[in-house]
Each structure stands twice: as structure tokens, then as C-alpha cells.
Design a protein with these regions (language model features):
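Phosphate-binding P-loop
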Residues: 27-35
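Short beta-strand-centered segment that lines the nucleotide-binding/catalytic pocket of NTP-utilizing
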Residues: 62-78
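Short phosphate-coordinating micro-motif centered on Lys-Gly-acidic
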Residues: 2-7, 98, 104-163
């Protein structure tokens, strides 16, 4: 397999952001890995990190609301094929707070960890498989995926094949 380390896509609106999340889930399902998968979601306030998370979580068969974990730090979704942990570390004042909540216990097998504002937990979080950078592009968004591990490269390679 050729190493593929970057991928970008123009996202027109909120619906397209959710569809892109579903596309990522389709690729993850094709890989059929039981490993923990970690995405760092990077972008300014309002760029669509939580919207992308909602698209991913709903594509994994969650039928309820997907809310931002800004005040709770983490929302857990125990779904049929995978557990998803959606973190929002924006309000984290000290990375050591993550130790008190048992952060290392979240990164176990067969889970997907979506982490907004990961830089606030630097040194205590699992390594990201994918860095997901969401950038304003006028009223739309540009998403850039950067592989940080072999698993991240596999995700991007599959994604590239499907588009």
C-alpha cells in the first residue's frame, strides 16, 4: 500500500459536514479494526467540530441528540459496533484534570475517540491517528486530514479510493 498522509475536502454546509462524517464511518467500518481510533478535531470556534462529530456518531447508529460536551468534558455513546467518546477540552483549565477523570481508561479497544481542543490535554492524551483540521473558507469549510499513524494512513488511503 502506498503511504497516503493527507487528504482535503471542501465542505459546503452543515449537511455536507455530517455526510463527510458518515463517509469517515464507512471507511472505518471497511477497515474492520478493533483498535482504538483517535481523531483530534482542530479548528476555531464555530468551524464545525461538533457537527462533524454528530455526523460520525449518527452514522454509527446513534438515533438521539448529539450534544457538545463543552461542560461535561466527555459524552459517551455505547453503540452496536463501537463505543464513541466525544471530548471537548475547551474549558479545561489544567491538563491534570484529565488524570482525575481517568483519561487513559477511555482509549481502549474498539472505541473511537473524537477530541476537540486536544492541545489543552497535551501530554495526557493518546496519540491521534488523524489530525482533522477544519478551516473557514468564506461561508463554507475546508477539511484537511493528516495521518499521524499507520492506521491514519489506512483511513486516508481508503477515503481517497472512495472519492
Amino acid at each position: 500500500m502506498t503511504n497516503v498522509s493527507c487528504y482535503s475536502q471542501y465542505i459546503l454546509d452543515e449537511n455536507a459536514m455530517c455526510q463527510f462524517g458518515a463517509q469517515l464511518v464507512s471507511v472505518i467500518n471497511e477497515l474492520n479494526t478493533q483498535k482504538a481510533i483517535t481523531f483530534y478535531l482542530n479548528g476555531d470556534l464555530g468551524t464545525g467540530k461538533t457537527t462533524l462529530s454528530r455526523g460520525i456518531i449518527q452514522a454509527l447508529d446513534h438515533h438521539g441528540n448529539v450534544k457538545s460536551p463543552t461542560y461535561t468534558l466527555v459524552e459517551e455513546y455505547h453503540l452496536p459496533n463501537k463505543t464513541v467518546y466525544h471530548f471537548d477540552l475547551y474549558r479545561l483549565s489544567d491538563p491534570e484534570e484529565l488524570e482525575f477523570m481517568g483519561i487513559r481508561d477511555y482509549f481502549n479497544n474498539n472505541c473511537l475517540c473524537l477530541i476537540e481542543w486536544a492541545e489543552k490535554g497535551q501530554g495526557l492524551l493518546a496519540e491521534a491517528d488523524l489530525l482533522v483540521n477544519i478551516i473557514y473558507a468564506d461561508s463554507a469549510r475546508n477539511i484537511e486530514l493528516i495521518a499521524n499513524t499507520t492506521l491514519g494512513e489506512q483511513i486516508i488511503a481508503k477515503l481517497t479510493q472512495t472519492t
